[in-house]
């Protein structure tokens, strides 16, 4: 399943991607999905045309055609002279994998990702985001593996948690909050930032339902383009400095997920200013300041 999360947004399109496992797959809240992308059909056929190759050429193993074998190969590398399709393939490396924070927990029976489209200098869709949001057909198999991410795992008790994120970083926080609500742990606080509330409030209905049922005790939203002066997540943190200190005194654990440039560094500085560098470092060493940033 593939749904646009931000119609008419000022930012690039962001999608809710839902994948169904073909066999038992286990992950924990906070884990990462490593996706093996494939080339678009158009990209493969352009490559075949450029090198005057027949898509239906059978390879030496007799199992695959050339067009099938090129699906997960890096087609951007320079090519040396070759005599056969197999000699060509020997020159091509596999496409690199792409990592995404998982937004769901196994009991939901779906592996959910939040993927924003990225574009290169030529205006072409990025490798991972293009594959997941545009090129892969609905119902097509997606190759992935789960990467254990213990440094961002959920604590196994009912201490308060403070979740801080922006944009697609909400994904990793949603998995934590889904897990907490299943356990009926209610001391949860979410800070979320995006551009405009009308267009970029990802998973609004779920978040507001948690709030109305008491599963989300506090919610602070920062929509930067909804007022003349831009407001970001770190501004909201500073506004709530005294309440934040109270939660930390109650042994709260801080989780930060999202862009390392801008949000995560600004949040880190705000936390240093509010709590002091010494206390923030103590929280880090105690496993009470956890980050999944990219």
What are these regions (language model features)?
Residues 1-294:
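FNR-like FAD-binding dehydrogenase module
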